[in-house]
Amino acid sequence: MDDLRGFLRQAGQEFLNAAGEAAMGAAKDVVGSVINEIFIKKEADTKRVLPSIKNMRVLGEKSSSLGPYSEVQDYETILNSCLASGSLFEDPLFPASNESLQFSRRPDRHIEWLRPHEIAENPQFFVEGYSRFDVQQGELGDCWLLAATANLTQESNLFFRVIPAEQSFEENYAGIFHFRFWQYGKWVDVIIDDRLPTYNGELMYMHSTEKNEFWSALLEKAYAKLHGSYEALKGGSTCEAMEDFTGGVSEWYDLKEAPGNLFTILQKAAERNSMMGCSIEPDPNVTEAETPQGLIRGHAYSITKVCLIDIVTPNRQGKIPMIRMRNPWGNEAEWNGPWSDSSPEWRYIPEEQKAEIGLTFDRDGEFWMSFQDFLNHFDRVEICNLSPDSLTEDQQNSGKRKWEMSMYEGEWTPGVTAGGCRNFLDTFWHNPQYIITLVDPDEEDEEGQCTVIVALMQKNRRSKRNMGMECLTIGFAIYSLNDRELENRPQGLNFFRYKSSVGRSPHFINTREVCARFKLPPGHYLIVPSTFDPNEEGEFIIRVFSETQNNMEENDDHVGYGGKADTITPGFPTPKPIDPQKEGLRRLFDSIAGKDMEVDWMELKRILDHSMRDDLPKPVVFNRFSNNMAFETQAAGPGDDGAGACGLLSLICGPFLKGTPFEEQLGMNDQSNKRLIGDNPADGGPVTANAIVDETHGFSKDVCRSMVAMLDADKSGKLGFEEFETLLSEIAKWKAIFKVYDVENTGRVSGFQLREALNSAGYHLNNRVLNVLGHRYGSRDGKIAFDDFIMCAVKIKTYIDIFKERDTEKNETATFTLEEWIERTIYS
């Protein structure tokens, strides 16, 4: 150790300077790499993962009044530009590169991106129209997307909403195509170029049986762009794609556990033009895919009609529930049991009834079954309930009914609104809450009840799989509300402690959407969507479909100042107000203010850092690297020149010297020997080197500037004594409230308590504002530090005061010019 100390003394200040420069360089490299990792990845994510959501216009709406993003792609603009220049479009947001193919690994062979005219002669968008034969699977595991695409071909109005028909490889061809998908409540236009991945000149992924037909391959590429890459499409549910094609809500039923009113459900779905399908689960123990009854295992059938058919026999007269299905193969592979094409049962059906249902006996893959045989021979039925805007005017005029729909967007923010399921009672009530009001029962419902479908969908998870983000485990619960309970916004802990749910999602499950159907009497109901565990971050939309009108609203607080009724949350003691002694306060102010008898933010910071040093993180400042950082080693004497260098060397080289003899010589294995001291040891004393990352020196300059601005009426940047006195009184109140909610005395409060703490300070905030505060001021574990809590209170008070000043009519409306708004807010 003596040799090492001698070396360090000889190096002296030269070593410290070199080490300081090296440390600064290393720090810059580390910080730079972190910034690059965060922001460059974020930029790539913005451009590649969700290009169409961010950059495409919502169909039927104007673009944002804030002006377009630089990456906005407008189909007509790009098309006309390419036609004018004679060039073919190359999409910079979804380039012909490996990143658009896969995110987990590089392709195992050379992939060549070719345009259709380089793949086939006389390329066509459609060849003799479109059909399910145009949908053939390639090497990508996206059969769920193909099944949905095949179903889409059965409905022309839905098909051409997704796939605009005016596109071709002849007239106005410029290598650009566009497709439309529903994404989380909005229709987005996705633009692509027509370069497609090939191997040995053949399309690798979705393709048509006709080599020169390309609508299906281009549709798949647009869907891949929507989700960031082709690989993002591996594995999924047909329901997911059907929703993206229609904007509907999908539900499915296990026919072995079918509800007693399933036939009525199917009937009403058919009346609303819902898309329906069914299937038989494949049996690994059975080699033949075809059953003795002519049905195909593991194969999707379309349900094309659900009705009651009149039947007249010598022994019976009445109606029989029937279902018509179609095998998409369109061949002789049909049901051969009762009510099949050659079945004798049809002779008991009146001729006018046969004509009414359009009965034919062609070998076209279409056949009829009784509902009971349907339950006996199929395993699963899926229903895609179409949104109200999916029905054409002609369909509505022809008697097709539509669903009534309400929708809200929401967010789970860790420590704020991510409360987890009912198992976590203390935080469950912090989840977003929604009220639906059902007024009229369903028509023809003998029990006077309302059919309600609740669908909870998490947003953007598939598109973020390249960042290791999978679906959260989600679900929801439904509670009835009486008139008195309606007054509570939101419902608090005690409501859920003593109230039982009247409905809930069948499971908490890690799929994009969880959906359930309920029969509820008219009334008011509270829906609480949540993740299974608390503190899981995500965005969602919640939709409610009903046969009669439903009114939906967010059950949340109104933003503003509270009234006299605001109290500390039950169970917490009321804080004692701190009344500073005016004489002592005046002396303190006079000693700091100087000749102008005003304090600026720096002088305010000195006062607050001194008076509230026990409530703030311990000071850490950096000698040579920023302001003044000194290392101290207990083994070194006061005059030992090597002490600071030892500490510095330990900090810089520690990670590289672990497990070597130098670790013991430098004392790196004894954490108690390494300390950092601030400018003023009395402000908090030594702290360990490991605390550097988490600690700051007193109130930040931004907090102090904002506190001055809050009361600085003349915008001088300074406070007089009366303003200073008012500010300290506000801070004393906020400090007292903070201590009440800092139950563990850690200098931090849980984000879940932020609403109650701010309510106690007199501020009412809703979930949207609380989420923003959580993102802005919360730590990774959802905690809020004391100075950040003060900043929250300062900002909220300032902005409310700015707004209230202009809300002269007290109708929650204020008018500012852009200049006025910037002037008022930028100083705050």
Curated annotation (Swiss-Prot):
PROSITE patterns in alphabetical order: CALPAIN_CAT, EF_HAND_1, EF_HAND_2, THIOL_PROTEASE_CYS
Site (Cleavage): 54-55
Region (Linker): 558-577
Superkingdom assignment: Eukaryota
SMART domains: calpain_III, CysPc, EFh
GO BP, one annotated term: protein autoprocessing
UniProt-annotated binding residues for Ca(2+) 2: 742, 746, 748, 753
Entry PTM: Undergoes calcium-dependent autolytic cleavage between Lys-54 and Asn-55, which is necessary for activation of the protein.
Keywords tagged on the record: Autocatalytic cleavage, Calcium, Cytoplasm, Hydrolase, Metal-binding, Protease, Repeat, Thiol protease
Compartmental location: Cytoplasm
Regulation: Activated by millimolar concentrations of calcium, and by phosphatidylinositol 4,5-diphosphate, phosphatidylinositol 4-monophosphate, phosphatidylinositol and phosphatidic acid.
Family: Belongs to the peptidase C2 family.
Additional free-text comment from the UniProt record: This protein binds calcium.
PANTHER family assigned to the protein according to its UniProt record, in alphabetical order: CALPAIN, CALPAIN-A-RELATED
Name this protein carries in UniProt: Calpain-A
Organism the protein comes from: Drosophila melanogaster (Fruit fly)
